From Swiss-Prot:
Alphabetically ordered keywords of this record: Isopeptide bond, Ubl conjugation
Keyword Ubl conjugation: yes
Organism: Saccharomyces cerevisiae (strain ATCC 204508 / S288c) (Baker's yeast)
Protein name: Uncharacterized protein YKR041W
Chain residue numbers at which the record places covalent cross-link Glycyl lysine isopeptide (Lys-Gly) (interchain with G-Cter in ubiquitin): K17
Organism lineage string: Eukaryota, Fungi, Dikarya, Ascomycota, Saccharomycotina
Positions of the UniProt region annotated as Disordered: 30-67
Length: 250
């Protein structure tokens, strides 16, 4: 068979066949899905790709229910609060603070000027009262010590009087045992003489009547040349005690 026969047979077969245009359904669906996904990519955030359709629907419903309600802001009240706060701060800072008192562990008390003055006045009044008490106590103690010292000196003088010899200057049986030359008439009285013999009896552990009888002889006016008036007055006081003691013992 020649080449022309092959060619004629092919042409005849082609004339008998009817060609139908194929429809690619799957390919079309893929294109629609691609278009749909591309639209989703345009309108949604990339983070929403993994979300399920039901979840996205719920989120869209929730978003649709949110309503923004305008709220009226009262700005003047806020300004008033700020002003009030500012006023309080300025008044607290305007008050000048002062340190007061002694330092304790490196810190001192802090107070206002009026309070500091009040504390200072009260402290001064307390200090003055305490000083008055201290002065009174000191004077009282000083008075007691002075009295004790005077009594001790008087006791020493009394003992010395009864140990006196004839060669020593004559001292009188009076508080302080003054000498005959130094004593005055006003210092010689019955009370002072009686006090001297009472103390002498206690210190010397002797009978007061015996001591009075001894001095009644010592201070007789006939035994003294000088200071006759003083000796006479002293003898009269001693003699009066002597008569009194004798009368009481009868």
């Amino acid at each position: 068979m020649s080449d022309d026969d092959y060619m004629n047979s092919d042409d005849d077969n082609d004339a008998e066949k009817r060609y139908v245009r194929p429809i690619f359904v799957r390919k079309r669906r893929r294109e629609e899905d691609y278009v749909a996904t591309s639209k989703d990519n345009i309108h949604h955030h990339p983070c929403d790709w993994s979300a399920k359709p039901s979840q996205r629907q719920n989120e869209n419903e929730q978003k649709s229910t949110i309503r923004l309600v305008p709220v009226a802001m009262n700005t003047p009240k806020c300004q008033e609060k700020k002003k009030k706060r500012k006023g309080v701060g300025t008044t607290s800072h305007e008050a000048t603070l002062f340190e007061y008192g002694e330092s304790i562990a490196g810190y001192k008390c802090v107070t206002t000027e009026s309070e500091r003055d009040r504390l200072k006045r009260s402290h001064e009044s307390e200090s003055s009262s305490e000083s008055e008490v201290d002065v009174f106590a000191f004077d009282q103690a000083k008075g007691i010590s002075s009295k004790v010292e005077a009594e001790e000196r008087y006791a020493r003088a009394v003992r010395q009087y009864w140990r006196m010899t004839k060669d020593e200057p004559a001292t009188l049986p009076l508080p302080g045992t003054p000498t005959l030359a130094a004593v005055s008439l006003d210092m010689i009285d019955d009370k002072s003489v009686e006090q001297f013999y009472t103390m002498s009896s206690a210190l010397m552990d002797a009978n007061r009547l015996d001591l009075i009888r001894r001095d009644r002889i010592r201070w007789h006016p006939d035994k003294h040349r000088y200071h006759k008036s003083k000796v006479t007055k002293l003898f009269q006081a001693i003699n009066g005690l002597w008569e009194q003691e004798k009368t009481e013992k009868r």
